[in-house]
Amino acid sequence: MSGFSSVAATKKVVQQLQLEAGLNSVKVSQAAADLKQFCLQNAQHDPLLTGVSSSTNPFRPQKVCSFL
Protein backbone atom coordinates (compact mmCIF):
# COMPACT_ATOMS: atom_id res chain seq x y z
CA MET A 1 0.00 0.00 0.00
CA SER A 2 2.75 2.48 0.85
CA GLY A 3 4.30 2.04 -2.62
CA PHE A 4 1.00 2.96 -4.28
CA SER A 5 0.48 5.98 -2.03
CA SER A 6 4.04 7.09 -2.71
CA VAL A 7 3.43 6.93 -6.47
CA ALA A 8 0.16 8.84 -6.09
CA ALA A 9 1.84 11.50 -3.96
CA THR A 10 4.68 11.83 -6.47
CA LYS A 11 2.17 12.23 -9.32
CA LYS A 12 0.44 14.99 -7.36
CA VAL A 13 3.74 16.78 -6.83
CA VAL A 14 4.63 16.48 -10.52
CA GLN A 15 1.23 17.86 -11.54
CA GLN A 16 1.63 20.81 -9.18
CA LEU A 17 5.14 21.54 -10.44
CA GLN A 18 3.95 21.41 -14.06
CA LEU A 19 1.18 23.83 -13.20
CA GLU A 20 3.59 26.22 -11.48
CA ALA A 21 6.09 25.98 -14.35
CA GLY A 22 3.44 27.21 -16.76
CA LEU A 23 2.66 30.36 -14.76
CA ASN A 24 4.07 33.71 -15.76
CA SER A 25 6.14 35.18 -12.97
CA VAL A 26 6.35 38.86 -12.12
CA LYS A 27 9.14 40.52 -10.18
CA VAL A 28 8.14 41.61 -6.69
CA SER A 29 9.22 45.18 -7.43
CA GLN A 30 6.93 45.29 -10.48
CA ALA A 31 4.02 43.76 -8.56
CA ALA A 32 4.51 46.30 -5.74
CA ALA A 33 4.60 49.18 -8.22
CA ASP A 34 1.42 47.93 -9.89
CA LEU A 35 -0.31 47.57 -6.52
CA LYS A 36 0.74 51.07 -5.47
CA GLN A 37 -0.53 52.49 -8.77
CA PHE A 38 -3.87 50.70 -8.34
CA CYS A 39 -4.23 51.98 -4.77
CA LEU A 40 -3.50 55.56 -5.80
CA GLN A 41 -5.96 55.39 -8.71
CA ASN A 42 -8.77 54.01 -6.54
CA ALA A 43 -8.13 55.92 -3.31
CA GLN A 44 -11.10 58.26 -3.84
CA HIS A 45 -13.49 55.28 -3.79
CA ASP A 46 -12.06 53.68 -0.63
CA PRO A 47 -14.36 54.26 2.35
CA LEU A 48 -11.50 53.58 4.76
CA LEU A 49 -9.66 56.60 3.35
CA THR A 50 -12.54 58.94 2.52
CA GLY A 51 -14.94 58.00 5.30
CA VAL A 52 -18.62 57.10 5.11
CA SER A 53 -21.32 59.75 5.19
CA SER A 54 -23.41 59.57 8.35
CA SER A 55 -26.64 59.29 6.36
CA THR A 56 -25.55 56.09 4.60
CA ASN A 57 -23.64 54.53 7.50
CA PRO A 58 -25.58 51.48 8.75
CA PHE A 59 -23.46 51.36 11.92
CA ARG A 60 -24.21 54.89 13.15
CA PRO A 61 -25.69 55.20 16.65
CA GLN A 62 -29.46 54.94 16.57
CA LYS A 63 -31.49 58.00 17.54
CA VAL A 64 -33.63 57.81 20.66
CA CYS A 65 -37.38 57.90 20.16
CA SER A 66 -38.74 61.22 21.44
CA PHE A 67 -42.23 59.83 22.17
CA LEU A 68 -41.10 57.79 25.15
UniProtKB/Swiss-Prot annotation:
Positions of post-translational Cysteine methyl ester modification: C65
Keywords: Cell membrane, Lipoprotein, Membrane, Methylation, Prenylation, Transducer
Pfam family, one: G-gamma
Keyword Cell membrane: yes
Lipidation (S-geranylgeranyl cysteine): C65
One of the protein's GO biological processes: G protein-coupled receptor signaling pathway
Keyword Membrane: yes
Identification of the protein by name: Guanine nucleotide-binding protein G(I)/G(S)/G(O) subunit gamma-5B
Natural source organism: Homo sapiens
